[in-house]
Amino acid sequence: SNTVIVDFDLPFGTAGLDFNQDPLQGVANALNQPDRLDPVLLERMMVRCNERLSLFAAPASLDEDYDFSTEAFEEVASKIRSTAPFVGLDLPHLWSGWVRRVLLISDEVVLVATPDLAALRNGKNLVDLLKAHRPNDAPPRLVLNQVGAPGRREIPVRDFGEALGVTPA
């Protein structure tokens, strides 16, 4: 496949739901034993959505605690990156050593945010972190979600982008 979507939001990821998939194995299994992963095992753990897209889904339960090391996430991400030219990592809305590391080693970052004050603050922090640690890289792409949702106060798209120093897509 050309593209793999990896749902690293282990407890609450929705990529499996979004693609109507409920695989027996997924990214949590890979994180349990990253040293055992090879291209054949990875292929079996991923769900092929179509000829050009595969999904590496998060578990659909809270039966386990998901306390994996930064090294495990980095190793799994690296091995997945070797299987396809395009890999999208869906990261959870939390801050940890492994999230930071995955962001810093990514070729490109796409920041998805809602146009509200909390997302502006969090987005600004992420953009500033990436600028400080990746000064020669392009800024992240910005995708604003839920723009114009009824009953919600929002920051205008142009103002949001200007505050981050990034042009919204």
Across the structure, where does each feature detected by a protein language model lie?
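Short, histidine-centered active-site or binding-site loop motifs used for metal coordination
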Residues: 59-60, 144
